[in-house]
């Protein structure tokens, strides 16, 4: 009986471990240097995705002591970038990536489920990110 429980536990752990990489590869947002700019990137791993710059709902800048510092997003065609001041140490942001639903063929469409025929999975993707450019105090 103990051996059966042990095997069941190992099987459960293996199934959970296989599910984690898919979760870890979800789209995220972060700042990265692109050419001569600090650009807000939305993507997964190596892949940058185009996005609607109007999806940025909140952006807050902080210095090393977490005092507010002005940070203004600058719009590109399908991205945002910032020009950090010398005292900018961290940036918090919130982004509404919109609704996404799969269609009957499994393709992802940027619409809510009730607008996509045959959809079985949908999401309203909200992204939150804290980005550090310099060390901060505790």
Model-derived segments and their meaning:
Residues 10-19:
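Bacterial N-terminal signal peptides
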Residues 20-26:
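Sec/Tat signal peptide C-region and signal peptidase I cleavage site
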Residues 27-138:
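N-terminal soluble domains immediately following signal/targeting peptides that reside
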Residues 1-2, 15, 25:
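Generic low-polarity alpha-helical segments
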Residues 1-10:
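Bacterial N-terminal signal peptides that target proteins for export
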């Amino acid at each position: 009986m103990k051996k059966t429980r042990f095997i069941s536990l190992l099987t459960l752990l293996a199934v959970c471990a296989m599910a984690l990489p898919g979760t870890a590869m979800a789209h995220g947002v972060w700042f990265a240097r692109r050419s001569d700019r600090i650009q807000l990137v939305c993507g997964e791993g190596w892949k940058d995705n185009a996005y609607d710059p109007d999806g940025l709902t909140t952006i807050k800048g902080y210095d090393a002591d977490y005092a507010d510092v002005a940070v203004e997003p600058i719009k590109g065609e399908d991205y945002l970038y910032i020009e950090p001041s010398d005292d900018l140490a961290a940036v918090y942001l919130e982004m509404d990536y919109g609704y996404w639903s799969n269609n009957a063929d499994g393709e992802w469409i940027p619409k809510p489920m009730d607008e996509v025929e045959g959809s079985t999975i949908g999401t309203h993707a909200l992204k939150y990110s804290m980005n550090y450019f310099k060390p901060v105090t505790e």
